[in-house]
Amino acid sequence: MIKLKQLIAATLLLSTAFGVHAERLKDIASISGVRANQLIGYGLVVGLNGTGDQTTQTPFTLQTFNNMLSQFGIKVPSGSGTVQLKNVAAVAVYADLPAFAKPGQTVDITVSSIGNSKSLRGGALLMTPMKGVDGNVYAIAQGNLVVGGFDAEGRDGSKITVNVPSSGRIPGGASVERSVPSGFNQGNTLTLNLNRSDFTTAKRIVDKINELLGPGVAQALDGGSVRVTAPLDPGQRVDYLSILENLEVDPGQTAAKVIINSRTGTIVIGQNVKVSPAAVTHGSLTVTITEDPIVSQPGALSGGQTAVVPRSRVNAQQELHPMFKFGPGTTLDEIVRAVNQVGAAPGDLMAILEALKQAGALQADLIVI
């Protein structure tokens, strides 16, 4: 195998030969097992300006508060009645523990109210252990919250709320107490997982690594992962991966897709979408019903009674749009231009795309989310 120092020079020479669409390997793939881990905890935020939990409706807040006091040797008398706390809120604390995080390092945390607190603005999180999915404590969180939202309420009941005042963040608010075991330095191979599975991209990664390091160093396991041989020494392994992750690879083109969000009317058409020969016309029918009741007045001395008689007016109006034709291999630009010429709204475009798909003329996957 070529020495690492020679690999660095070879990498610099090869990287200049790639096209403008090449992407770094670190941007399209990740190393198996090297990932962040989620942490979660439960704690109390104190120091709120009367915007804390209503303990009569959230008894767990009062229970947590009493448990905290008991740890300091303070016991609330049972006959003291219901304690009302207005400046305390029960919160959920969560964070992502980065890969290779070491004890003593800090991570950002997010704090969210789980009771009926109106706002966490101005509050401070008390010491909260943060656990992983295995139940072990990996970090301790504490600090003053940064809340971007606020709310205000007048005596007449008028209220204004900006952003979300019931959630905030503490930059560097958790101190790492335990490292997560990693299999990074185990074995003589590493697996690269593609962010988006694609057989073409996987093959190009294998070809590029083998071109640089020699035949058989990289092997594609499937369309989403590539296994590479790696040095056993931890220091050499770091140097080795620093070379691999900066290799530039031309990723394969994505499959042709049309994404439709029926709730928001958003339509995203991929670059490779094409349409077979087809003729399309689309019109909309608008039906308007107007209620115009009239008063029926009986004649004099007829003995009748005045009555309100309903009268409805129904009007139907249909908008006619000209027919437009798609030729063979029509591209995205031509589709958009043709639809814009007839003034189709997003809802109309959805109907047109669905009809083209049903007719077999849309050469793409139609995905409705």
UniProtKB/Swiss-Prot annotation:
One of its GO terms (cellular component) is outer membrane-bounded periplasmic space. It is found in: Periplasm; Bacterial flagellum basal body. GO terms for molecular function: structural molecule activity. Keywords: Bacterial flagellum, Periplasm, Signal. GO terms for biological process: bacterial-type flagellum-dependent cell motility. Its main location: periplasm. Pfam families: FlgI. InterPro entries: Flag_FlgI. Residues 1-22 form the signal peptide. NCBIfam families: PRK05303.1 (NF003676). The basal body constitutes a major portion of the flagellar organelle and consists of four rings (L,P,S, and M) mounted on a central rod. Belongs to the FlgI family. This is Flagellar P-ring protein. It comes from Pseudomonas savastanoi pv. phaseolicola (strain 1448A / Race 6) (Pseudomonas syringae pv. phaseolicola (strain 1448A / Race 6)).
